[in-house]
UniProtKB/Swiss-Prot annotation:
A Pfam family it matches: UPF0122
Name of the protein described by the UniProt record: UPF0122 protein EUBREC_1504
Function: Might take part in the signal recognition particle (SRP) pathway. This is inferred from the conservation of its genetic proximity to ftsY/ffh. May be a regulatory protein.
HAMAP family: UPF0122
Family that this chain belongs to: Belongs to the UPF0122 family.
InterPro entries cross-referenced by the UniProt entry: RNA_pol_sigma_r3/r4-like, UPF0122, UPF0122_fam_protein, WH-like_DNA-bd_sf
Length: 114
């Protein structure tokens, strides 16, 4: 997964676990696409301080993911739903019962994961 996209997913799931200052700096870097220098000027800290803070935030978010696996589960379910969508379209064309069996198996797997 692209680094910025991964950072966005991690933030979406775990961002509220960061303190307000960490969230602001992380949002400015990841979502608002501000440079380290721009953030440093805005926050009144050094560029190195901003870089260190972003690195610590990334580590925290990755640690949460390592323990909770919410992004991993989300991506897995998203992939399964995409596959169900494809199979449904195929079924509309062919009316093949085997496709319905596969859809049922995937949906059962999703329910077990939840």
């Amino acid at each position: 997964m692209e680094e910025k996209l991964e950072q966005a997913y991690l933030y979406d799931f775990y961002g509220e676990l960061l303190n307000e200052h960490q969230r602001q700096v992380y949002e400015d870097f990841v979502f608002n696409d501000l440079s380290l220098g721009e953030i440093a000027s805005e926050e009144g800290i050094s560029r190195q301080g901003v870089a260190d803070l972003i690195k610590r935030c990334n580590k925290k978010l990755l640690d949460y993911e390592a323990k909770l696996h919410l992004v991993e589960k989300f991506m897995s379910i998203k992939s399964d739903i995409r596959r169900i969508h494809e199979l449904t379209n195929d079924f509309k064309k062919s009316h093949n019962e085997l496709l319905m069996n596969e859809i049922e198996a995937i949906s059962n797997q999703i329910l077990e994961e939840l």
